[in-house]
Amino acid sequence: RSVFKAFREAFVEQVQRMTIGNPQLESTDQGALISAAHRDKVERHLAVAHAEGGRLLCGGDRPALDDDLREGFYLRPSVFDSLPFDCRTNQEEIFGPLATLIPFDDETEVLTMANSTPYGLAASVWTRDFARAQRMSEGLDAGLVWINSWMSRDLRAPFGGVKQSGLGREGGLEAMRFFTESKTISWPR
């Protein structure tokens, strides 16, 4: 909690610097959402966050882009604070550019908040302390935990969620096991 204000300011500043546009360009940080229905779903979640008392710190609108990108389903990344960890916004899988910032006092408190959701696809732990990174990653109910990174993984490594975030694993030997249908044939002696 002691670093929350400084972290919030730095995080919002970084989000506001993100370049939205053509995902084929190296300079682009965020491309379009997959469809109009997807963008509409994320915008409904933005309305829910407002209704739950969230304070919008940045984003939440459709960016004005060049003519060749106007038909895309773009949405600026949104950052909220002032939302409780157990509100709908923080308990559902949104799959869109929406983040909420929540202060915490210790590891036990933040693990309780993070593990309260019925989902557990992926998580990210950011720290300079290796031992803390290990404790937190082991304590998180998530199928994949990144440490000091996001969206980086070896495609040979198993990937999949826990709880309501999926069944089975993709990637590596775990995927072969998941898609293998064993059959036992028994003959009498």
Where in this protein do the model-derived segments appear?
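Aldehyde/semialdehyde dehydrogenase
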Residues: 1-77, 108-143
